[in-house]
Amino acid sequence: MVNFLEKPVYKRVLLKLSGEALMGGHRSSSIDPEMVNAIAAEIKEVVNLGVSLGVVVGGGNIFRGVEANAKGMDRTSADYMGMLATVINSLALQSAFERIGIDTRVQSAIAMREIAEPFIQRKAMSHLEKRRVMIFAAGTGNPYFTTDTAAVLRAMEIKADVIMKATKVDGVYDKDPVAYSDAVMYKNITYSDVLAQNLKVMDATAISLCRDNHLPILVFNLQKPGNIVRCISGIPIGTLVGD
């Protein structure tokens, strides 16, 4: 258990997870139960701090629509398949959360009432006020939009203070830190600089939406245990993208 501050610096947060994050170190499996359980344990600490939390997860561990389109698949069909992959991941997270006592609801942008509620903004807000964790599935429900853009939309709709983007590296760098040992990490950077330098934080649509609505983005390393709680507690890690 990680305890930093009694009062978190953010009251409502949208956490964006990649689908690949659920794979953990087991690249032979789409979903690693140990990794999902580790994420759930950190989420419980966040809930115990009194933070209101929404989650958007990608589907790239199961299916990547952009890659399928590049190989000849119709883009609309490929994107819908990717959206369905996010539903699978959302249900995996819900199961892990509820197993350790986190009251959770999944809302889907594509109607599938047998397994998830439809996305209704007022209902999502009501769940959050009752201290339920919200998992938003199926992206925006429309092709040609990424799950990063979906995360920004949901963050604005639930009036989140910040969108926390979980990654495999410590923050935003001037170039790929995996390929270049001299890559420099930014502590703070503006939306406009991210767009001008074509830094791979989120797609341009998502970054522009954040800029237009003054929604800060905190980019951090999910692979370091305790980092979700550190971010919410105001510990200076990662990169903050803002005005």
UniProtKB/Swiss-Prot annotation:
Name of the encoding gene: pyrH
CDD domains xrefs: AAK_UMPK-PyrH-Ec (cd04254)
Reactions catalysed: UMP + ATP = UDP + ADP
GO MF term (any one): UMP kinase activity
Amino acids binding ATP: K16, L17, S18, G19, G60, R64, T167, Y173, D176
UniProt subunit comment: Homohexamer.
Superkingdom: Bacteria
Transferase as UniProt keyword: yes
Keyword Nucleus: no
Stored HAMAP family: PyrH_B
Gene Ontology CC terms, in alphabetical order: cytoplasm
The species this protein was found in: Syntrophus aciditrophicus (strain SB)
Main location: cytoplasm
Activity modulation: Inhibited by UTP.
E.C. numbers: 2.7.4.22
Family to which the UniProt record says this protein belongs: Belongs to the UMP kinase family.
Protein's name in the database: Uridylate kinase
